[in-house]
């Protein structure tokens, strides 16, 4: 769907929860009294992971500090970090839980975590000049593409070179939304004109493979849940997955 936020909520919550804009979290530290806001009371992927004894962390580029619930950094209109790209900040059970808030970290923390004990699930978000989309301070499409490519090379390279990367590890690169302004259909009614994004899976197992089935962000959540042997949340319950990209023999 459009804009960004509902897609991020779908990735970890299995629903868009009626959200149709990029309004801030009701827990934002710099929320003004006049601003509308969103929050989600229900369960998320974080609850599922921790209930199963697994760990998570968000690594957000240009987030000022761990647990910071600021709307933007630097402040708008020059924002690089944008809260609309951090779905964890919207869930009550995360934003009101100090221990979980500490798992929402600046990207720089990834280096230390890769050298020690990395989380079972790492959710990495580039800033708005490195995500291929751009902002008021970075509009040139050629530079955006180059910077996005450099970000991926550096980040994926660091992960794969770390002690935590094993034959059971995987990286999924995806986007929140495409350029189309059309409202996407359900997977079963997909058309070529719908909102489409590229999604790439990286593992050390098998050769190149393609999944050309119509998928959405519920499919990504379902794939993560199936991979960790978790039950599926909400609209992820009936979603097709990307598992054919991972169910391949390792050398």
Model-inferred region functions:
Residues 1-251:
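N-terminal pro-sequences and low-complexity stem/linker regions of secreted or lumenal proteins
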């Amino acid at each position: 769907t459009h804009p960004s936020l509902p897609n991020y909520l779908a990735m970890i919550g299995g629903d868009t929860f009626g959200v149709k804009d990029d309004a801030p979290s009701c827990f934002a530290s710099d929320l003004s009294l006049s601003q509308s806001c969103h929050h989600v009371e229900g369960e998320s992927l974080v609850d599922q992971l921790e209930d199963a004894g697994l760990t998570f962390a968000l690594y957000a580029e240009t987030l000022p500090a761990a647990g910071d619930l600021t709307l933007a950094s630097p402040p708008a209109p020059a924002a690089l970090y944008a809260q609309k790209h951090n779905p964890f900040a919207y869930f009550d059970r995360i934003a009101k839980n100090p221990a979980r808030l500490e798992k929402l970290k600046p990207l720089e923390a990834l280096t230390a975590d890769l050298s020690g004990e990395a989380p079972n699930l790492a959710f990495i978000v580039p800033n708005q000049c490195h995500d291929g989309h751009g902002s008021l301070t970075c509009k040139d499409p050629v530079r955006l593409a180059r910077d996005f490519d450099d970000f991926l090379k550096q980040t994926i390279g660091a992960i794969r070179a770390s002690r935590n990367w094993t034959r059971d590890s995987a990286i999924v690169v995806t986007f929140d939304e495409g350029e189309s302004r059309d409202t996407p259909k359900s997977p079963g009614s997909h058309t070529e004109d719908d909102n489409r994004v590229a999604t790439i899976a990286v593992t050390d197992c098998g050769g190149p493979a393609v999944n050309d089935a119509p998928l959405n962000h519920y499919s990504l959540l379902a794939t993560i849940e199936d991979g960790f042997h978790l039950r599926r949340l909400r609209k992820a319950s009936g979603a097709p997955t990307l598992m054919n990209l991972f169910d391949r023999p390792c050398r």
